[in-house]
């Protein structure tokens, strides 16, 4: 089982410090990914993804000045500086992660319909338009 010559503590403390927090013990180096710029020669790491430069343009996550490369025309109108181009949400969606119950959605639909200034012709029109009273001059 345990070595009787090991002393009072049968499990000696670990000599290896993996984190590199001890200045006497530097962190272990990974030979597959050496630190620093790529040396001119054989590419290290995964040959499918060389660490020097990607084989395709990677868009930066920063929004200002982001131009997608490709045959797509620029968005019209161009977004204001400092604002990201935003795709309109699908119908029924309000925003990222926002869920609205049916009652509130119905209210919002009604308010949205009211905001349109189109005259609706039909039996169920609750508002009496003033266009029919124009003959009382």
Curated annotation (Swiss-Prot):
<feature type="region of interest" description="Disordered">
    <location>
        <begin position="94"/>
        <end position="137"/>
    </location>
</feature>
<keyword id="KW-0804">Transcription</keyword>
<comment type="function">
    <text>Negatively regulates TSP1 expression at the level of transcription. This down-regulation was shown to reduce taxane-induced apoptosis.</text>
</comment>
<keyword id="KW-0805">Transcription regulation</keyword>
<feature type="region of interest" description="Disordered">
    <location>
        <begin position="26"/>
        <end position="54"/>
    </location>
</feature>
<keyword id="KW-0539">Nucleus</keyword>
<dbReference type="GO" id="GO:0005634">
    <property type="term" value="C:nucleus"/>
</dbReference>
<feature type="compositionally biased region" description="Low complexity">
    <location>
        <begin position="125"/>
        <end position="137"/>
    </location>
</feature>
<protein>
    <recommendedName>
        <fullName>Proline-rich protein 13</fullName>
    </recommendedName>
</protein>
<feature type="compositionally biased region" description="Basic residues">
    <location>
        <begin position="103"/>
        <end position="124"/>
    </location>
</feature>
